Amino acid sequence: MFFESYTEKVWGRQPKEISAAWGAQRIKGLSIRKVLIDMVKKLSRLNSSSATISQKGTETSLIERFLYPKLGPGQMWEEVANDLRAQGVNIHLRHNVKKLQFDQGTNKVISAEIWDDTSFTTQRRDYDYFISTMPISELIESFEGPVPEELPTAIQDIARKLPYRDFITVGLLLNQLQGPKGEELDDTWIYIQESDVKVGRLQIFNNWSPYLVADASKYWVGLEYFCNKGDSLWNLDDSQMIELAKREMDRLGLSRYDDCIDATVLREEKTYPAYFDSYQDFDKLSAAFNALPNLFLIGRNGMHKYNNQDHSMLSGFRAAELIAANKLDQSSKSSLWEINVEQEY
């Protein structure tokens, strides 16, 4: 299998140990026949003057063109935040939800205990609706006091035991970057199938947007490593991770060891919600959360779903639509879980 080595790097498991739901979600209805049809369509578009960014009807796995903010995806959310503030919306940054409290009569969440990282104080606030993007394993631990009967201990245990994979990015600033045969690399990202290196994927930030790199004669790349917090890879210090990344770029023939002129390391926990262990009972968990009228789970970690960024955003739109229409019943909320099961964009 072409992606076998990469899959093992990402999940730390052999593909046969992972739920088929993950593979089905990633490749959707892809087949050799559909790949060939897509190739013919692309050849036709090359000879057409009407080619646009629109790719309606294209298989999800075969999307090749997309819009990208010139300063990265965070730029879009900064603009959204500025627009909201201009409309009088308060956005509290550096605040962490620590506890959620239920009303036993309605099964609604009624208040949140919030830690303010700027003032080092705790506040309790009441809200009408709660939209969560935090990992479900952390959300379940935030419930304070008696919880609704829809969340018995067995259901809570499913949430607590949900598996995740953690993530390390090593950024290298390089004098030179090229393919193994000396060719120019125009990819935005490259999957690394080789089993003799630990890196799983390479991002070339120059190719995402030239505005992300101060000096156009240099190359910023990100080597992505998948691990679990506390394992041997996670426990390497930053200097050791940088050393590993430089050696592996050299081994792959993408740059020489001495081409690196600067480096940085970023670590992120629970980057990938995993599809094994207690995930096999996830349907019971999602049904239980659907029974809590004013609590909506969205996003990759919020739904424990390996969404792309666009599908994560769509889940937020769908939650807002349900709230605006006062559709808080289980049946209506179940529509959130139908996002990212379609075969096409």
Model-derived features: positions:
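General small-molecule cofactor/ligand-binding pocket signal
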Residues: 90-92, 261-264, 296
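C-terminal lid/capping helical subdomain adjacent to the catalytic/cofactor pocket in oxidative enzymes
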Residues: 266, 276-345
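Short, surface-exposed acidic
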Residues: 1-3, 16-18, 152-159, 254-262
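Active-site catalytic microenvironments for nucleophilic, acid-base chemistry
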Residues: 9, 83, 138, 142, ...
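Mid-domain catalytic core of redox enzymes
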Residues: 69, 93-239, 243-255, 281, ...
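Active-site/ligand-binding neighborhood in enzyme catalytic cores
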Residues: 1-102, 110, 115-118, 126
